[in-house]
Amino acid sequence: MATYKVKVATGTDFFSGTLDSISLTIVGTQGESHKQRLNHFGRDFATGAVDDYTVQCQQDLGELIIIRLHKEPHSFLAKDPWYCNYVQICAPDCRVYHFPAYQWMDGYETLALREATGKITADDTLPILLEHRQEEIRAKKDFYHWRVFVPGLPNYVDIPSYHPPPRRCRNPNRPEWDGYIPGFPILINIKATRFLNSNLRFSFVKTASFFYRLGPMALAFKLRGLVDRKRSWKRLKDIKNIFPATKSVVSEYVAEHWTEDSFFGYQYLNGINPGLIRRCTQIPDKFPVTDEMVAPFLGEGTCLQAELERGNIYLADYRILDGIPTVELNGQQQHHCAPMCLLHFGPDGNMMPIAIQLSQTPGPDCPIFLPNDSEWDWLLAKTWVRYAEFYSHEAVAHLLESHLIGEAFCLALLRNLPMCHPLYKLLIPHTRYNVQINSIGRALLLNKGGLSARAMSLGLEGFAQVMVRGLSELTYKSLCIPNDFVERGVQDLPGYYFRDDSLAVWYAMERYVTEIITYYYPNDAAVEGDPELQCWVQEIFKECLLGRESSGFPTCLRTIPELIEYVTMVMYTCSARHAAVNSGQLEYTSWMPNFPSSMRNPPMQTKGLTTLQTYMDTLPDVKTTCIVLLVLWTLCREPDDRRPLGHFPDIHFVEEGPRRSIEAFRQNLNQISHNIRQRNKCLTLPYYYLDPVLIENSISI
């Protein structure tokens, strides 16, 4: 007789335990055990429990390679889902085998788990292991399907349990509730939350935290009448009362300094859309700025051409917004423009706007606004640029380049890499909750009753069109942060804390990824010969980039350096990139004139006519303002059940080498966090959005 000591760990989230019957089959290189029920006196498989069992076998099974967990009915009790963390088995020779699960078993089913050692296809020689990894991929591809979201955008998850089961009620003609309460500011897709596959949706704690925070705030907005007022704001200072209890050093600074040119320019470097600005070496023909116009703002002893040659002129071009139609909001037609803004980096270290044009087409009805124009002309011109920032940020930098692309990375990973693959183990922590938050996001933003339709001047179709244009211009190099800074010509720009912090995090990730990949891939041939890896890369190119060759995305990877860069890009996109554009949203937008989602008057065609009243009448009305800010408030408040970058409580790697690499990664991140906090002590306006302590492992909000 051979005795195997078994530990079974149940998840710690609420309702992770089960009352169903759980049995175990152990498979080794020398045989297979009988199915044996795991049962002892008292409660089995309670939430958070680690249960110990003894399994007797007729013979030694040799090296353990696979186990099967069988979930079956228990007596007359109803079906009860179970979340299994892992199974650990101590063999008769005292060798301990680890079998990671970290997934739900909802129904009566059998789950086969491999021993935790990471292996690429070439490492598997036993037919049973090759068959297992092939069957796992087949099952995932049968379950997870691609679905077209909007033509021209990355495809997304379409799984059977996304849709609710058939309705069972006496009156089939009664309309179903769509998750929207008339009069309230937002729509929540309850179905997407409730019926999403268990392994993709929020934990109970995160779900409860999300709705517990959102519900009372939405109710407060309703009771205060903020979402029913379709009129203009009477006074600018009234905007501060929207969130009287939600203040920070940054939000207070924004409200006090939003009119200053230096702060306007600062936001291009360290605001919530810091990846747009480019060094300008030649003034575009469509933006006919002359030396005579801007000479007073460049300082003595220089001129526009000299500053261009020195690399001190920068351009923010919102051409991606050109020609998109607007909609009516609250009975009033909204207006739109695609501005260009020229900036100068001066010897005092300030990035200053020196010229703004509110169109991509110059002409007599499109004046170039300058800092020495009237106070309200210049302020309104800057506000139009900030309006364009809203769409550049929300549609492209935030929703497209982090959420939607991250979801495509996630789905391709689930469909093409088995759990034993080292890249699956490396990247699965960075996919946590991405599908769930995107399901909610599609209901909040991209829905006929959502934010884009009810509070954005471009409406649902226009907002989607901006994203489609964004994807058509997206390149592989732009997602690889070091290349992006060089390509935009900002690699040596002083005071660019976003660049400094993002590079620090990128290189820490790159070092970690390098150690993991070189542990499992001995040479370039192993990379090129890994069919699962190549299918993953090809599917991302096809379903995320829609097969667009001009994107520069690889369709295959042939060398270890190529694989390292690619995996680092995926990891960064699904964590730090999102943190940089998401975490500061409320701080920079709670003062609405700094980030308006709509404009109620057309862009100025003549100078000298703007007044305080016309400025107020151009800004979004009270209702539109509050709908947008409520949604952004929700997106900036990470619900409970957080996992900061480098925090990997789920044990996927068991080998000593990768475990050391994980610990070294954590230490590097801790040092980066320390450096950021020390630097911020000397700054009037701290930049902390890329502090690793504040970065989530995944896109989970």
Curated annotation (Swiss-Prot):
SUPFAM superfamilies: Lipase/lipooxygenase domain (PLAT/LH2 domain) (SSF49723), Lipoxigenase (SSF48484). SMART domains: LH2 (SM00308). It catalyses: 1-O-methyl-(5Z,8Z,11Z,14Z)-eicosatetraenoate + O2 = 1-O-methyl (5Z,8Z,10E,12R,14Z)-hydroperoxyiecosatetraenoate; 1-O-methyl-(5Z,8Z,11Z,14Z)-eicosatetraenoate + O2 = 1-O-methyl-8-hydroperoxy-(5Z,9E,11Z,14Z)-eicosatetraenoate; (5Z,8Z,11Z,14Z)-eicosatetraenoate + O2 = (12R)-hydroperoxy-(5Z,8Z,10E,14Z)-eicosatetraenoate; N-[omega-(9Z,12Z)-octadecadienoyloxy]acyl-beta-D-glucosyl-(1<->1)-octadecasphing-4E-enine + O2 = N-[omega-(9R)-hydroperoxy-(10E,12Z)-octadecadienoyloxy]acyl-beta-D-glucosyl-(1<->1)-octadecasphing-4E-enine. Belongs to the lipoxygenase family. Changing residue 351 to V: In strain: C57BL/6 X SJL. Residues 2-119 form the PLAT domain. Increased by calcium. Pathway: Lipid metabolism; hydroperoxy eicosatetraenoic acid biosynthesis; Lipid metabolism; sphingolipid metabolism. It is found in: Cytoplasm; Cytoplasm, Perinuclear region. This is Arachidonate 12-lipoxygenase, 12R-type. Fe cation binds at residues 398, 403, 578, 582, 701. It holds the Pfam family PLAT. Mummy, a recessive ethylnitrosurea-induced mutant has a nonsense mutation in the catalytic domain of Lox12b, resulting in truncation of the protein by 68 amino acids. The affected mice are born with red, shiny skin that desiccates and appears scaly. They probably die of dehydration like mice with targeted disruption of the gene. GO terms for molecular function: arachidonate 12(R)-lipoxygenase activity; arachidonate 12(S)-lipoxygenase activity; arachidonate 8(R)-lipoxygenase activity; iron ion binding; linoleate 9S-lipoxygenase activity. Keywords: Cytoplasm, Dioxygenase, Fatty acid metabolism, Iron, Lipid metabolism, Metal-binding, Oxidoreductase. Binds 1 Fe cation per subunit. Changing residue 390 to A: Reduced enzymatic activity and altered stereoselectivity of the oxygenation reaction. Disruption phenotype: Mice die within 3 to 5 hours after birth due to defective skin barrier function loosing around 30% of body weight within 3 hours. Dehydration through the skin is increased 8 folds. The outside-in barrier acquisition is also affected, the skin remaining permeable at 18.5 dpc while it is impermeable in wild-type mice. The stratum corneum is more tightly packed while other layers are unaffected. Processing of filaggrin/FG is aberrant and the skin displays structural abnormalities. The cornified envelope is more fragile and the ceramide composition of the epidermis is altered. Its cofactor is Fe cation. One of its GO terms (biological process) is establishment of skin barrier. InterPro entries: LipOase, LipOase_C, LipOase_C_sf, LipOase_CS, LipOase_Fe_BS, LipOase_mml, PLAT/LH2_dom, PLAT/LH2_dom_sf.
